[in-house]
Structures are given as structure tokens and as C-alpha cells.
Amino acid sequence: MERIKELRDLMSQSRTREILTRTTVDHMAIIKKYTSGRQEKNPALRMKWMMAMKYPITADKRIIETIPERNEQGQTLWSRTSDAGSDRVMVSPLAVTWWNRNGPTASTVHYPKVYRTYFEKVERLKHGTFGPVHFRNHVKIRRRVDINPGHADLSAKEAQDVIMEVVFPNEVGARILTSESQLMITKEKKEELQECKISPLMVAYMLERELVRKTRFLPVAGGTSSVYIEVLHLTQGACWEQLYTPGGEVRNDDVGQSLIIAARSIVRRATVSADPLASLLEMCHSTQIGGVRMVDILRQNPTEEQAVDICKAAMGLRISSSFSFGGFTFKRTSGSSTKKEEEVLTGNLQTLKIRVHEGYEEFTMVGKRATAILRKATRRLVQLIVSGRDEQSIAEAIIVAMVFSQEDCMIKAVRGDLNFVNRANQRLNPMHQLLRHFQKDAKILFQNWGIEPIDNVMGMIGVLPDLTPSTEMSMRGVRISKMGVDEYSSTERVVVSIDRFLRVRDQQGNVLLSPEEVSETQGTEKLTITYSSSMMWEVNGPESVLVNTYQWIIRNWETVKIQWSQDPTMLYNKMEFEPFQSLVPKAARGQYSGFVRTLFQQMRDVLGTFDTVQIIKLLPFAAAPPKQSRMQFSSLTVNVRGSGMRILIRGNSPVFNYNKGTKRLTVLGKDAGALNEDPDEGTTGVESAVLRGFLILGREDRRYGPALSINELSSLAKGEKANVLIGQGDVVLVMKRKRDSSILTDSQTATKRIRMAIN
């Protein structure tokens, strides 16, 4: 108090005021504090002090030519004294105003291109609709979300290379643009930004926004795609939320959504094939999403979802260390356990072998619609605190936690036998057996669990076996909370291994993911997914299988034709014919196959009966294991459009229609491609034309290796002999002429010789 009084007295004296306002500061410590280092110690004060001066800005001397000395009001815009210590001119802030009003105007054509993300945001907000505001206490949980809509998915390093190449193409430094997306973006941006006068640094910043995914760990209730996150401050507060529908979609959200759908389809399909891992990789490598290879997206996109993570693990990429069970992501937050095999008896006296986790552990469980904290000991649930959107979601979380706890009363609650199978008809492991059982009906589980009286704890209430909330009693150890559990925030990724059956394990051998965890939910992808693998033809139904099978034969006709005559068994075993078998009535498969194979053998034996169209038409039927029978067929049945449709052995049908005039094939009315050669063109035409320069020596001679296709003949050296397959499926021996002079007569001789060789 004394000090304050003393200060007041001092301030009342005019000399004190003068010392403080007029005299210079000459205490070395103070001068040091404010002048050492290049960092401004008090930017706000510095700005005020500078702007109070008449000429606070310095500019290049050229400014004198472009700005008048005085403005319309006669105020001086720049000083004739140059800046101390440099040859720059001192300029008044009024000069900036003059420049903004009267200075040269540049082309604005590049602004929407450089500031694309801002322009697009304005459009989305313009077309978005804001609904009513609701005041309520909502459960927000922190999730890792994407905060800049409309970006590509490049890694920071890839983006840096693209930005350097676009903005500073002449700078030194090794830049390697490898991925397809890098090259595409670089080309597009270079074209867009020709003659661009916007400062390169600004362009670089804006490009970074466009190319790299930026994520933040934010409290969210509701939509997590980037078009919702950009308006988070408008749609949810501490105790209110406002409904909002975005006025547009952005590619990065669509990529994530479509990636999940593609990955789920691929994992589901791979599970039922003979070698799930090999099939999964083949499909990932041959699939495109929105025109970009799926493997490129998997490498760059941080989307975390069970099927996506299985695909990433198969490609040898790192994934999150959390594990999945019952559609919930579990992350162990404390404790540890050891695993031990144990046999237990269900309520139906069925023996199950389960891997028991011995020890005390705590987990967070995060699902789409519910989150929970789980504390468990060996085969005992200690505490479960759940929060969720509705009763159904809360029930799902409770069931998963009860099964995960491996408690005896849960196993004893099983009624009936457990015999759930996966898509490949293999029995599920015991933990998933139990899970499926109680997901179907959890009534007995909840009733057998036991209830207990509860204390009154802020923000927590009990839940009874019929899922009604209560403040007095609750299922043992289970409580409902208003607060959500935050998603696991770390972006740490770990090395994992994957086995043939797509089970993903961490380096300690814990199973993180398996195909049982992949959701069965079907959605409609936002971007076009193109599955080139024959394994995925059936995704779009029987018609797609039919059309794709025939398109594949036509596309690969040159090699198919050679295999047909030389190594038919290998051809029949091709995986491309697998999906087709599901269209052929089960009872008829073997007989059709036997019949077609016999027919083909006759074509090979009886020269001149080769028939391109018929081979293409019947080939898929020959792929099934054949049954020997004397049966003859005039048509073969395929199950499409909900009923059996016929393919005629001789002639066209709605299923398989070949137009001789246009040489095009239509399957179920869809174009399946053009055939290279007309089966009826006799021996002249194509062969004789192509065989110019070759001498036909006679029938096939096996010593000269397998038959080449006509296109492969060009690689022969002069005088070299080879077997060649000609249009009728016949193989002849030819020799490349040593001289070129007689080429003209070759085509006539060839025609005669082929006839002789065949007859």
C-alpha cells in the first residue's frame, strides 16, 4: 500500500512525467532486452509506434516513377530523404491507399485457380442449408478428422516435390515425381498457372492446402467428413447444435468412402477363394477408384477401417496398433495380459477352446454409434462405462464387452449349438461364435449377468437387463455415461504380419484384425470403382459375369486360340472361367463340360472344322470338371435375369449373338467386342496375306516347338522354320524366305500349299 502511495506522489510531480515521456531510455539492460536478437519483442507497440511516424514504410526507388509525390488532397506520399542504411525510399501509408485506388490492375484469371479451396468453400456454403438450432447436451468425442476439404492425398514429401516443380521449376535440388497422381497434378498445375503474377510463396501455400491431408483431433458429435468439419464452429457448441446439409461434396471424402466399399467387397470375395491372400492382392492391384489405382490410394490415404487395414497389411504397409472386435476398435490404455488356451462348457454343454487373457487390463472401445471404457480382469468384467446415441447402440457395445470379458456366466448363457460359418463355409473361431450368438439375441445373457445397487455418481446412471435406465440398480459393473470416450488420438503405425487367411497380427502375435471383423454393410460408392479382376465380376450380378467372361475371351483371343489347340487343360483351368460356373445349373455342369470338350476334340481332329464363334461361345462351359456321357445338346442353359436362358450350340440367341456383317458380338444386348477373323473366310484372305515372305513346308512338325500366332511370325530370322496356327485352327510348318524377290507370288502359292498341307 505504501509503495502505491509513493508512486502516486511521484506521478503528481511534473518532472517525473517529463522523465518518463521525454527522456531517452539509457539503461543498458533495457536496451539489450529490446534490441538483441531479430525477434520483435512487442510487435503491437512497434506497429503503433511505426505507423505514428510520417514515413513508416520503405520501398524500392522505382516507386518514384510509379506514384506521384502528392495525392489529390495534396498530401505527400513519399519523402525525398532516403532511408538510412539502404538506398530505399521512405513512403507514407497514404501511398498504399493511392496504389490500391489508382495503381495498375493485374489479370484476375489466376485467382480462382490459386485460391481454389476458398472459392469452392464459398460455393459449398452458398448452396448449403442450415436447419434449426437445438439446445441439448450432446455427446462429443474427439476424433481425428480431415480439416481441409478438396485435397488430393499426397504425402508431405510428395507434395513438396510437386510444389517445387510447379512454383520453382528452376531451383536446384533433386525432385523425383514417381506416382501417377504426382505427375498428373504437376502437369495440370503448370498449365493452369502459366503467366501467374501471384507471389510464388502464396501459390506454394495454397498448393499445399490442395495436395496434403491435414488432420486435427477435435471433439465432434455428428458428421466427420471434411465438409462438415469446415463448419464445425457453426454446427455445434457447448450445449447447442445446428443442423446443416453441405452444399457440395469433395473428392477426398468420396475417396475415403469409396475406398471402404471397395476394400470390403474385395476382402469378402477373397475370403471364399482358394488362396485368400493372393486373391486379395491380385484384386487390390487390378482395381481403380475414380480412375486412380487402389494400391496408390491405400499407400496415401489414412482412412482406418477394418477392410481397408487388411488390404494395407497385405501390401506390407503399417497400420494402427489398435485391434478390432465386434465392429469396435479396442485400444489398451493400461495393464497387460498373457494368453492361455482353455476349454469351457457352454449352457448347451458344447466344448469351446478359447484363448483366455490372464491379467488386469483397461481398454477404450470406439464404435460408429457408441463408445465405452472397459476394465477387465481374467475372465471377469470389472467395469464398463458406455455412452451411445440410442438404446440399440448401447446394447451393441454391452454385448461386445461382455463377450470380450470371457466371463463364465456369458458362456453359460448360450442356448443351442454354436455353428456359425463364414462366407467360405468355415466355422468361425469360438469368440466370434459367441459374439454372433448374442448379437442375434442377448436376452438370456443380460438376465443371467446379475444386477447390483448403484451409488449416485454425477453423469452416470445404471441400466437394467431390459435396457431401461435406472438410478437405483444396474447390470453388474455396467454404467451409462453422458460423456463419450475419445477415439485413440495417436497416429502411430506399427509393422504387422498377415497370414494366408487374412488374419493380421502385430509383432507380439496378437490378432488385430480378421475377415470376421469386416462389416457386411453395403453402400453405394461416390466414385466409380472399376474391378478388373475376374474375381470381382460377380459383384455386379450374373449379367456382368456373362458379359465380362466373353469380353475376356475376345480380348485375349490370340493366346486363347493357341492354348485351345495345344494345351486345352491349362485353358480350361483358367480362373477367369470360375465366376461363370455359378451361372450354369449345378446338375448340368459336368455333362455340359463333357459334351463341349468332346466337341472341341472333334474340331481339333477333323481339319477344317475350326469355328471361332463356336469356340468362344462354348469355351466357358468346358471349364467345369467333365462327366463322360453320351448326351448331346442343342442348347445350353445359363441362369441370368432370374431364370434359365438358352445359348444355342448352332446359331444366335439373345444371350449370345454374333453379327457376321459387323463382326461384333453382343451378350444379353451388351457389346462384348469384335472378332479378329471371320470363321468363314476360307483359307485365302488373312493367312495368305500374312504368309507372304514365308514358304509353307507342310503339316505341323513338333520338333519346331509350339505353334506361334500369325503376329509372332515377324520375329523369325530368314531361313528359320516354325509351326504357325492359321485361322481354321490348323497348324502348318513354315519357313521364312531367304530372299525377298518372290514375295509377290507367295500369296497365291500359300493358298495352294495350305490346301495341300491340310488335305
From Swiss-Prot:
Keywords assigned: Cap snatching, Eukaryotic host gene expression shutoff by virus, Eukaryotic host transcription shutoff by virus, Host gene expression shutoff by virus, Host mitochondrion, Host nucleus, Host-virus interaction, Inhibition of host innate immune response by virus, Inhibition of host MAVS by virus, Inhibition of host RLR pathway by virus, Inhibition of host RNA polymerase II by virus, mRNA capping, mRNA processing, Viral immunoevasion, Viral transcription, Virion
GO CC terms: host cell mitochondrion; host cell nucleus; virion component
Subcellular compartments: Virion; Host nucleus; Host mitochondrion
Transmembrane keyword on record: no
GO BP terms: 7-methylguanosine mRNA capping; cap snatching; DNA-templated transcription; symbiont-mediated suppression of host cytoplasmic pattern recognition receptor signaling pathway via inhibition of MAVS activity; symbiont-mediated suppression of host gene expression; symbiont-mediated suppression of host mRNA transcription via inhibition of RNA polymerase II activity; viral RNA genome replication
Membrane-traversing stretches: none
Record-annotated site: Mammalian adaptation: K627
One Pfam family matching this protein: Flu_PB2_6th
GO MF annotation list: RNA binding; RNA-directed RNA polymerase activity
Gene3D superfamilies listed in its UniProt record: Polymerase Basic Protein 2, C-terminal domain
Protease found in the keyword field: no
Motif Nuclear localization signal positions after renumbering to this chain: 736-739
Subunit relationships: Influenza RNA polymerase is composed of three subunits: PB1, PB2 and PA. Interacts (via N-terminus) with PB1 (via C-terminus). Interacts with nucleoprotein NP (via N-terminus). Interacts (via N-terminus) with host MAVS (via N-terminus); this interaction inhibits host innate immune response.
HAMAP family in UniProt: INV_PB2 (MF_04062)
Entry's family note: Belongs to the influenza viruses PB2 family.
Role description: Plays an essential role in transcription initiation and cap-stealing mechanism, in which cellular capped pre-mRNAs are used to generate primers for viral transcription. Recognizes and binds the 7-methylguanosine-containing cap of the target pre-RNA which is subsequently cleaved after 10-13 nucleotides by the viral protein PA. Plays a role in the initiation of the viral genome replication and modulates the activity of the ribonucleoprotein (RNP) complex.
Full protein name: Polymerase basic protein 2
Organism per entry: Influenza A virus (strain A/Swine/Wisconsin/1/1967 H1N1)
